[in-house]
Amino acid sequence: MKEIHLKEGPFIKSNLKTKNIFRNIFIALIPLIIYAIYKNGIVVYQNTKNINDLFKPIILIITSSLVSIISEYISGRKENKNILIDIKEKSSFLIGLIVSLMLPVNIPVYIPLIVIFLVIFFKNVLSKKINTQLFNPIALALFIIFLILNFTSGINFLNNYEKNNIKNDPFNLVLKGSSEELSKIGELSDYFVGNVPTALGVSSALVLVGFIYLICKKSVKWRVTISYLLTLFLIITFIGFVKGEDFSFSLIKILIYNIVYIGVFVVSETYNSPTTPISEVLYGIIVGLLSVIFELLLALPYGIFLSVLLANLFIPSLDFFGARISLKDYN
């Protein structure tokens, strides 16, 4: 009888080394970094003339990336003699970078720094004890950060320039279902490009460019992303149709929730997503269904990240199922 052995990732069917995969992910993020600095730094400074506004995006991005490296080093230095090489191979800064681009520009910097440090430290310590990685560190960090914001200062994606020109944050309007106010803020194209209040470095148009690049470089689990986005698109569109909402409002919901960014850089995270084609598709569908429940129906601002964490629990079963199917096809 043939045995099925499931190992820890990353599992991307490519001849690329892991460090090259992470390098490609960083390259895909570069346009978003530039966008974040321009829209939430340079443009804001040109209107407010406040030098602090100019450097806010840069500080948030750099410090979040650095604290990822520091946490990786501290948690791994005792057991790994080649920790510096390991950090370089894993591109440890990517966790903090991906998290930072998803945050409000005016978030107190200490919140993501503390959370990112603790999440990476806990991840490394736990993974060494059980020899596997149970949860998506990016999703966990974002879940904790948004949970803290939700119960303290509240979640608001407006930068200081937008605060003077726009009364309401589109993200909160979507949670309340205020379609009329959303149409006043911008057209569908504005939401797609990112020319509205949104996360620090999220532009769905630029994310899709990065996604295409990653597919070409075979550095992303595209089945996870596509099945996740398609599931959400179909369900959100159907719910909107039942409610009599305009089709464009359904699309705006997807863009405001930053679902495209989450689908490309969070849900399909290299180490914490399934390893076979069928399990990748099923995983994306599960995350999509859970996201509908927590984010749309229950209106939890951190619902999508909670969905990813819960879906992580199904990965071993999905991989086992996918491996069995693959084995049958092989026989």
Please provide the spans of the model-predicted regions:
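Conserved mixed alpha/beta catalytic, RNA-binding, or beta-rich assembly cores of soluble enzyme
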Residues: 204-205, 216-248
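Structural signature of hydrophobic alpha-helical transmembrane segments
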Residues: 50-66, 106-115, 191-205, 247-259
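Small-residue-rich segments of transmembrane alpha-helices in multi-pass membrane proteins
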Residues: 91-101, 139-153, 231-239, 258-265, ...
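Long hydrophobic alpha-helical segments that form multi-pass transmembrane helix bundles
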Residues: 131-210
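Loop-to-transmembrane alpha-helix initiation sites
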Residues: 134-139, 251-259, 280-282, 298-309
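A generic, well-ordered mixed alpha/beta core segment in the N-terminal half of proteins
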Residues: 83, 87-163
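C-terminal ends of transmembrane helices
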Residues: 7-12, 68-82, 120-131, 208-218, ...
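N-terminal signal-anchor module of multipass membrane proteins
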Residues: 1-69, 73, 327-331
